[in-house]
Swiss-Prot record:
Family: Belongs to the ATP-dependent AMP-binding enzyme family.
Name recorded for this polypeptide: 4-coumarate--CoA ligase-like 8
GO biological process terms on file: ubiquinone biosynthetic process
GO molecular function: 4-coumarate-CoA ligase activity; ATP binding; CoA-ligase activity
Induction of the gene: By wounding or by jasmonic acid (JA) treatment.
Catalytic activity: (E)-4-coumarate + ATP + CoA = (E)-4-coumaroyl-CoA + AMP + diphosphate; (E)-4-coumarate + ATP + H(+) = (E)-4-coumaroyl-AMP + diphosphate; (E)-4-coumaroyl-AMP + CoA = (E)-4-coumaroyl-CoA + AMP + H(+)
Source organism phylogeny: Eukaryota, Viridiplantae, Streptophyta, Embryophyta, Tracheophyta
Keyword ATP-binding: yes
Gene3D superfamilies xref list: 3.30.300.30, N-terminal domain of ligase-like (3.40.50.12780)
Domain statement: Both substrate-binding domains (SBD1 and SBD2) are involved in the substrate recognition, and are sufficient to confer the substrate specificity.
Entry EC no(s): 6.2.1.12
Residues that bind CoA: 274, 453-454
Gene: 4CLL8
Free-text function comment from the UniProt entry: Carboxylate--CoA ligase that may use 4-coumarate as substrate. Follows a two-step reaction mechanism, wherein the carboxylate substrate first undergoes adenylation by ATP, followed by a thioesterification in the presence of CoA to yield the final CoA thioester.
Region (SBD2): 348-412
Amino acid sequence: MANSQRSSSLIDPRNGFCTSNSTFYSKRKPLALPSKESLDITTFISSQTYRGKTAFIDAATDHRISFSDLWMAVDRVADCLLHDVGIRRGDVVLVLSPNTISIPIVCLSVMSLGAVLTTANPLNTASEILRQIADSNPKLAFTTPELAPKIASSGISIVLERVEDTLRVPRGLKVVGNLTEMMKKEPSGQAVRNQVHKDDTAMLLYSSGTTGRSKGVNSSHGNLIAHVARYIAEPFEQPQQTFICTVPLFHTFGLLNFVLATLALGTTVVILPRFDLGEMMAAVEKYRATTLILVPPVLVTMINKADQIMKKYDVSFLRTVRCGGAPLSKEVTQGFMKKYPTVDVYQGYALTESNGAGASIESVEESRRYGAVGLLSCGVEARIVDPNTGQVMGLNQTGELWLKGPSIAKGYFRNEEEIITSEGWLKTGDLCYIDNDGFLFIVDRLKELIKYKGYQVPPAELEALLLNHPDILDAAVIPFPDKEAGQFPMAYVARKPESNLCEKKVIDFISKQVAPYKKIRKVAFIDSIPKTPSGKTLRKDLIKFAISKI
């Protein structure tokens, strides 16, 4: 592969393409990163200048926390974790909780100590969460009385939010503290904490990965600092703006945006406990929200229910909707702008492994490039590589997107899969091309993940469960297109001879074993699953067949 050293004289300013190494460079402002090696993400964010007063608002209770109170709470919780609980640099701490304004405090406290933050989806079943615990081996978990039973058999110590929560958890769970008391306790003034380095792991977030198996992604403090530095370099909103957080904070999309980036900009974030269209629009009106960050299915719902929304809610302060998780079609973008003419729609592209780096739309003019996910993020390099030959390609040629930059994760935890090369290139698993003006277009997904309402569903996991059914000979799971959800899991099932297995029984069999977003919602029966000579499922053939029947 060509040497990645850039030659500015050979870089086309129109699209950022360098002919000497077939690499695309960002057209955005250069990324300025701190030179200090001993620096954690919490310290970096807290050192920023804030013009706003309120950091977070709980939409359910209207409870507010100011920036000054937030940092005081972060300091006190970190002190308790260090001296009372014994959390040290490198220890893993799990957060298993629905959205609350306590989550940013917990996350920032944990990472300030050099401990490693990991999160789990509250909707996951106990067995799914316990598998993740077995892999990441957390020393402590922050959770709620409602979710504590899911980790009761793990034996790990837990911290709850309130004192009274202790009475509501199963016997046998080791409760070592509550967040309310930790935030009130004066710092101990004891020994200085361990020094944290930028290369230390800060977060261990679980991504489905390119093969569909759940993997922990190791991201360093330096990776997260680079993500936040991009927002500081090109702040996409002014500090007086108000955001509504509807996305889950356990996910990279929520964590990177609302625990880190918007906090560094000094903006106010209103946190909803869960997504509900009515509650979201009521919060937009009540708090005069200016910015929404959404996944595409919510955008579609806002289009379909625009007339009811405009009659019931005052959305006059709303100026921007940012969308991620999947590309927006021209029809959806134009449909939204027609219904909400004073609101701009910007979209972006990133992965758990890239920590927010990828591409984004940053202006009204750029948003008119329909179908594109934007220009490369500042500090990002990209290559388009033929997935079969490994040849590096050029403008308007489709291949696998490779990304490089300071935000790219260190790699997978306890997994030898090489998706980050020795030169630091992240193989995204997405088929893309970059046009003459440097805009990135997503064509298809090599990784075969199903994206249901912004959630990633690995087909391999569902296929393994299906094959445990006594009447199923073989099975394949594919993404089936859906206007509201984007995609949902559909199963092709080869029944054993003499079996009278029906669609409902297959759906019920899976629904008892997985989180709601992973449920199979359509089943078709087939004599045999088409496969390559090497035994790999020809999933694309099944997708084409399913779509042809619509």
